């Protein structure tokens, strides 16, 4: 059986994607006799896929093309089975304001937020728009691109003077910025895995960064973040977090695996932040840590998802 692991691409998260792809490929080789091919994504990809005719593809691309559904649309058009969510579900999950709205409509708590394109600030005047957002959302707030991951372009704003620079940083990664109320509490990631009996939440991962927010450096530099898996939460609160992640997985129509990021406030209430259709698989990533806490093998689980994808066709 030939399996192609797609990683890399041109997004700002290229390096993380390559690290995730290498780890998945290594785990698959150790757990199976599959022929595992690691492949970057460039203008030669489609020709290579047609020549290789793989039995299955595992997209491990982060950011645009990998998580916005575009590549998966192409794989579907080529009738190549792949692990992960279909394109339509990816588009819903990748757009943070859309995902927040859908989850809010499903009864899930999500912080108050405003999403505005760069053009609005030019047309209406940056100072007036920023003042209106502050009145609506309040401080502190976090600014982040509406599309993208790894906390690239994210900044925490404690006072109005920090707001303009935070917006500039966000617009460097996306034309639309999300300005979201900052909920203080415990940061938790809930990984969801599809099983023969349905989606299951894995042991929760609690994230304690040395920096103020769980930014790119804190995510991918060893020693900059402390992890607790399972999270140091009561059974009831942990179940509440798992329920939110399972709701996100279902409402957005996700498939195979996902990871939902939450904040648990002082009252034990989980607040939905975002969901990832291509969870990171690096040495410091949360999905593999939750798998390990459940005494599950990354290679064996991925192999099972490959077999399921092939059966789906």
Mark where each language-model region is.
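Short beta-strand-to-turn element immediately C-terminal to the catalytic PLP-Schiff-base lysine
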Residues: 116, 154-159, 192-195, 265, ...
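Hydrophobic beta-strand scaffold residues
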Residues: 36, 81-82, 110, 141, ...
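Active-site nucleotide/adenylate-binding loops and adjacent lid/helix of ATP-dependent enzymes
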Residues: 1-7, 49, 92-185
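ATP-binding N-terminal substructure of ATP-dependent carboxylate-amine bond-forming enzymes
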Residues: 1-101, 105, 117-132, 308-313
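Short, flexible, mixed-charge acidic loops at enzyme active sites
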Residues: 70-77, 214-221, 277
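ATP-dependent carboxylate activation and anion-phosphoryl transfer catalytic cores
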Residues: 234-313
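Phosphate-binding site of ATP-dependent enzymes
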Residues: 158-243, 269-271
């Amino acid at each position: 059986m030939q399996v192609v692991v797609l990683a890399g691409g041109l997004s700002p998260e290229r390096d993380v994607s390559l690290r995730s792809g290498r780890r998945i490929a290594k785990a698959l080789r150790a757990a199976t006799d599959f022929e595992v091919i690691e492949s970057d994504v460039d203008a030669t990809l489609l020709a290579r896929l047609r020549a290789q005719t793989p039995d299955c593809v595992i997209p491990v691309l982060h950011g645009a093309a990998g998580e916005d559904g575009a590549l998966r649309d192409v794989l579907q058009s080529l009738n190549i089975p792949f692990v992960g969510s279909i394109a339509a579900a990816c588009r819903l999950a990748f757009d943070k304001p859309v995902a927040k709205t859908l989850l809010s409509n499903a009864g899930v708590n999500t912080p108050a937020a405003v999403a505005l394109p760069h053009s609005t600030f030019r047309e209406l005047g940056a100072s007036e728009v920023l003042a209106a957002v502050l009145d609506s959302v309040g401080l502190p707030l976090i600014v982040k691109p509406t599309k993208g991951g790894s906390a690239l372009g994210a900044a925490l704003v404690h006072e109005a003077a920090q707001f303009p620079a935070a917006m500039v940083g966000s617009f460097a990664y996306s034309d639309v910025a999300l300005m979201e109320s900052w909920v203080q509490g415990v940061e938790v990631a809930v990984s969801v895995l599809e099983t023969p009996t349905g989606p299951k939440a894995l042991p929760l991962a609690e994230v304690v960064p040395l920096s103020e927010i769980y930014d790119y450096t804190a995510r991918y530099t060893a020693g900059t973040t402390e992890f607790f898996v399972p999270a140091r939460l009561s059974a009831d609160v942990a179940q509440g977090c798992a329920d939110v992640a399972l709701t996100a997985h279902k409402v957005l129509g996700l498939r195979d695996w996902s990871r939902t990021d939450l904040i648990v406030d002082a009252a034990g209430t989980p607040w939905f932040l975002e969901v990832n259709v291509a969870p990171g698989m690096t040495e410091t990533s949360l999905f593999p840590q939750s798998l390990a806490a459940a005494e599950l093998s990354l290679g064996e689980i991925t192999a099972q998802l490959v077999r399921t994808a092939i059966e789906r066709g």
